[in-house]
Amino acid sequence: MTGQELIAYKNWAVVGDVLNPSKFAHKIKNRLKEAGHNVFLINPRDESGEVFTSLQDIHEKVDVIDLCINPKLGIKIIKEADTLGMDKVLIQPGAASEEILSFCKEKNIIYVEGCALVELSKKGI
């Protein structure tokens, strides 16, 4: 699967510092919304109550997870995704690790290492 194929899916969970305007997770969230996607916001460290802290808190279908977080936290998210039957992830630069990639391969989770902003730009968004 390619990044362009992932971008075609409509329901996204963006995982990272989604409330901080200086972070890529925030920018990705905004661009996905501008492109007409449904976007769920996840930050495992959030204490504000403004976003979800885990994937299991989302009670709607998630097609793709955008992983924009430190790999040490990212592996926990990927393992949670597997238990919830979520099977597609876009892994942003800096969010990948051998452990994450090996786990995805082992569990048949479809993954693309790439950038959502680049993929959206290719579509003119």
What do these predicted regions represent?
Residues 1-2, 50, 54, 73-77, ...:
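Short acidic active-site motifs
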